[in-house]
Amino acid sequence: MTILEQMLEDTKSVAILGHIRPDGDCLGSTLGLYNYLRLNYPDIRAAVYLEESSPKFSYLKGYDTIRHQVDGECYELCVCLDSGDIQRLGDFKHYLDQADKSLCLDHHVTNTRYGGTNVVPDEASSTCEVLFDQLDEGKLDRYTAECLYTGIIHDTGVFKFSCTSAHTMEIAGKLMGKGIDFGAIIDNSFYRKTYIQNQILGRALLESITFFDGRCIFSAIRQSEMEFYGVDGKDMDGIIDQLRLTEGVEVAIFLYETGPQEFKVSMRSQYLVDVSRIAAFFGGGGHV
């Protein structure tokens, strides 16, 4: 019996949380757990609490049930997924504070082990990989598999990032065996962009600069530019990864303005630099 299964025993209600600005792994893991509970623990009252996210993930079952505001509900167990620290839970940390027990499932090397119980194997490719190992494979349906596969492809860059392991590929194969349309999931959630998203991506690439003999690349988008194109933070998805693919680049840095002189910073590296340590120094964290 896994740690998650032990904590679900005799539990009557579960709040499922992820991090602010939810991405593919966050949505995949939270909705994956939600669908698994609905199928295998029908007597448990469960709800997912997340900020608004990109509609490109609307194919995930349960997407339309996500709650975007703190309400008056109370839960016995709080499960936090893909969030390295309490602050990244945003306003929804309220449910962690009031729960009788809590579990943190994550894979980020910067995780602060803030849960009552923590499962954080930082060698895992994604939180969806961590979650898969906590579930009963035989009790997964296609909808849960779609969620988990979505998270894995997003945090592995469709299996090309260094975090991808043989175990990752083994899990992906098992999820494919559940009958998911893996090609459509990859195209619709990872590659396909709107015309406006392609425009802002092009702007970010056009305005980028390199330094340190071309080993670092930097780009930034101002709020005025975002207003001109009619985009928000959700439309910035994928820009940092495209910058990282520039030939000769080891570190990519991308900023977009969220308020007067306030910026959301994303960093990605190839192999030599651990950018998660830089992020942690400034109170952030995440992938290498």
Predicted regions and their residues:
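Hydrophobic helix-and-loop "lid/oligomerization" segment in the mid-to-C-terminal part
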Residues: T2-I20, G28-S58, H68, G72-L77, ...
